């Protein structure tokens, strides 16, 4: 990908980067383990973003 990105694309990539993480431990505790993992986790090589 180009080094010089439009601002909109850069913001979308930043949002995807922040949302691509495990859920906090306190969420697992608070929901009594009903929510254990993030279903929307994305691996950089397996699935690509539609940006």
UniProtKB/Swiss-Prot annotation:
Pfam families: Ribosomal_L39
InterPro entries hit by this protein: Ribosomal_eL39, Ribosomal_eL39_CS, Ribosomal_eL39_dom_sf
Key words, A-Z: Ribonucleoprotein, Ribosomal protein
Domain of life: Archaea
One GO cellular component, as annotated: ribonucleoprotein complex
UniProt keyword annotation of Lipoprotein present: no
One GO MF term: structural constituent of ribosome
Stretches of the chain forming a coiled coil according to its record: none
BP-aspect Gene Ontology terms: translation
Family note: Belongs to the eukaryotic ribosomal protein eL39 family.
The protein, known as: Large ribosomal subunit protein eL39
Organism from which the protein derives: Aeropyrum pernix (strain ATCC 700893 / DSM 11879 / JCM 9820 / NBRC 100138 / K1)
Lineage, broadest ranks: Archaea, Thermoproteota, Thermoprotei, Desulfurococcales, Desulfurococcaceae
